[in-house]
Amino acid sequence: MSLALLVGVSGSVFAQKKGFDYKFYGQVRTDLFYNTRSNSETVDGLFYMYPLDENLDPNGHDLNGVGNGNFYTLYTRLGVDVTGPMLGKAKTSAKVEVDFRGSGTTYSLFRIRHVYFNLDWGKSALLVGQTWHPLYGDVAPEILNLNMGAPYQPFSRAPQIRYRFTSNNFMLTAAAIWQSQYLSVGPKTNKPGETSTQKSQEFMKKSCVPEFYLGVDYKRPGLIAGAGLHVSSITPRTQSETEDAVYFVNERVTGISGEAHVKYTKENWLVSAKTVLGTNLTQTSTVGGYGITSIDEVTGKQQYSPLRTSS
């Protein structure tokens, strides 16, 4: 069980200079939470995902049956939307938004949420920068909790190059996506059979292949319906440290995921649904990972099988 208290204050300021329009916005947010037991979580318990299983000591007491709570203002945020001059036939715009989340276990520091520019030619648009991961999409739970439905709903903001084409009521989205704050999980060391894990950018960097997303949406007033396909490929290790030597290894874990969504709104109510078949989507705050299926007896090179989940 968790309890959240939200106090928001938002506003906007307009300015204009040499063909640019600026709209400043922000909010003051406070979060008071209490959890009845230990959980899988981030941000010191503020970003709740799911309760941890029982872990009994010799006396039968649950080590995870301990409550916790705190009060934070980390998600107070500031932002600016910029509308720029025409660039050829394209309308230009940009966004910068930050909060005080920090990174890892270092809190109360500026953190980038959204930073991108967008070129809009009418039917087609190109976005370059960091914004919501395409798997987050236009259909997500509307709740006070910061996790927005994770680990069932993918949650991530990621650097990307995204192209959208709109014709009549249909919109095609194609994106190449990298990782920055929300990362893949991999082995903590290069020893064969290592099961301790860590989150790191190295697994995607060494892969040299971004994530790819392709989706289609049907939109009309009050209705959104669509589906998307996502592919990711990471490199867990490039070296294997055996007892005798250090070997170069070429390892890769590739996963294909899919999602479908629908949202209908009318006057003061809405109905929405979304399903995700995910393969190793730890970088989107969902349940994921992969297991070792075989280990080479000489080099320690490992084969893997990704974890698939459905929500």
Task: Give names to the regions the model predicted.
Residues 56, 169, 193, 299-300:
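Intrinsic-disorder/low-complexity loop/linker signature
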Residues 17-44, 54-183, 208, 213, ...:
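Outer membrane beta-barrel
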Residues 38-43, 105-111, 138-146, 184-202, ...:
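Outer-membrane beta-barrel translocator domains and adjoining extracellular loop/strand segments
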Residues 222-311:
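Detector for outer-membrane/organellar transmembrane beta-barrel domains
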Residues 1-17:
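Bacterial Sec-dependent N-terminal signal peptides
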